[in-house]
Curated annotation (Swiss-Prot):
Matching PROSITE patterns: UBC_1, UBC_2
Encoding gene, per UniProt annotation: PEX4
Function of the molecule: E2 ubiquitin-conjugating enzyme involved in peroxisome biosynthesis. Acts late in peroxisomal matrix protein import, after matrix protein translocation. Required for both monoubiquitination and polyubiquitination of coreceptor PEX20. polyubiquitination of PEX20 at conserved lysine 'Lys-19' near the N-terminus leads to its and proteasomal degradation, whereas a monoubiquitination at the conserved cysteine 'Cys-8' is essential for its recycling.
GO CC, alphabetical: peroxisomal membrane
Membrane topology per record: Peripheral membrane protein
UniProt protein name: E2 ubiquitin-conjugating enzyme PEX4
EC number: 2.3.2.23
Length: 204
């Protein structure tokens, strides 16, 4: 199967799930608020929005990711990168639609106010570039993985970091010495500093 056929198959599956009414969305329950190609004319660049896990310093916030897909996908893994920025529009609340162009198009979608965060403080994520260190996105990738299942693995990584493979030394060192109070305080500090409240749609 060619990369484009595989990606079209995945996209159709995502749209089908997002349009299901009266049942919980597996994507939303896994913290995936949005997943789509940047353009339907180019399936090799996608964007995603991930919600932080509950009971962590990441909760009540979401992050955008850029996904660059190689021409030999799914044999080779896509590249996921958290979108980082210092240019945060603090003077207004923006509205995000997560695939929804019309309020009436998706019954059962609820609006929720979350913090749109432009930095990801985490031992396995580069603070200044958004690069991710995760084995299934590198040596342990197999064609059985999909974009949505890989995003689920990234959400799980947020709650279960690997300090021995760090891209953020400061965060990793706090984990290594088991100073969880300082670790969580630093997450909350950066999430507060580099975020703005936005409305998002939650499909359920």
């Amino acid at each position: 199967m060619s990369a484009e056929k595989r990606l079209l198959q995945e996209y159709r599956s995502i749209l089908k799930e997002q349009r299901q009414k009266g049942s919980a969305s597996t994507l939303s329950s896994n913290g995936i608020l949005d997943l789509k190609p940047v353009s339907e004319d180019n399936f090799y660049k996608w964007t995603a929005k991930l919600k932080g896990p509950t009971d962590t310093g990441y909760q009540d916030a979401f992050w955008e990711l850029q996904i660059d897909i190689p021409s030999n996908y799914p044999t080779q893994p896509p590249k996921f990168t958290f979108i980082v920025s210092d240019d945060i529009p603090r003077n207004r609340r923006q509205r995000q639609t997560n695939q929804i162009q019309d309020d009436d198009e998706f019954e059962g979608a609820e609006k929720e106010v979350l913090r749109h965060c432009y930095r990801m403080p985490h031992p396995n994520i580069a603070f200044n570039t958004g690069e991710i260190c995760l084995d299934i996105l590198q040596a342990k990738w197999t064609p059985a993985w999909t974009l949505s299942s890989a995003l689920t693995a990234i959400v799980l990584l947020l709650n279960d970091p690997e300090p021995l493979s760090p891209l953020d030394i400061d965060m990793a060192n706090l984990m290594k010495i088991n100073d969880l109070k300082a670790y969580n305080s630093l997450i909350e500090y950066y999430v507060g500093r580099y975020s703005i409240e936005e409305e998002v749609y939650i499909l359920n």
